[in-house]
């Protein structure tokens, strides 16, 4: 099974957001050594929960300290930006790391409404115009001409080069699936946002509506899943308590730093909170490396995914690194890494 990584640069209680950014850089090198195929960075703004506000900047830093792993955005929230500027950013990234850049594109704001307005006063209108933004961006990134009579048809995105980034469509609903299918792009469903609700439907719609493109003659699907592995089931459950408490806040619309297991244990849980946490746990992929890898493989088969991207969070960065290691080992990625090194 091909595995990738999504990193949101999660903020932890007792640590600064700046430390979370530096931990992202460390984790990228760690995951490359483990044999993961891609390392994707999220985009969120004005958030106390996640620090990753500029994936394109983090991508450049990771490109400078890695050699094999593909590096991508998951995603660039396109309504905030000019399609030309995004094309230029990703052409620069492609020049830095040729053949290793993924350009994941999303429509969601990754923020509250006021912050989205601060980023782009016309964000609401731009969100309704995403297909046109994607059309222009793909043309500028690939060097293809814009549509006839386009006012910017004579503008080229620089720097041009022999390779171009690989564009991806991202989403957690049928809308993103339709956009990806229309433009002939690989598609990644954000399973971790919906706890899997709508996943199979969106992927089936994507495959049914897919229009082959020159670069991608056939559909290709990834599913991004939250998962956590530890050396024992008991330790995995202890670490998961942080996620459970954080999710209770998120479900109320309050985005806070990830608490520690000790903070979760000390929390005065109400009956309603415990009931909600039990429902969340029933859907969560948590356990030993072998248990998690088995669940991920089963999920990929169930929804028809070609690969799985793993979002793993823990209050202790060492536990998060261990989670990715245990999953990689159980999935056989270490053997793939040795084979790559031998080549």
Residue ranges, per PLM feature:
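Flexible, glycine-rich active-site loops centered on histidine and acidic residues
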Residues: 2-19, 79-145, 195
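An alpha-helical appendage that flanks or caps ligand/catalytic pockets
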Residues: 123-156, 197-305, 335-343
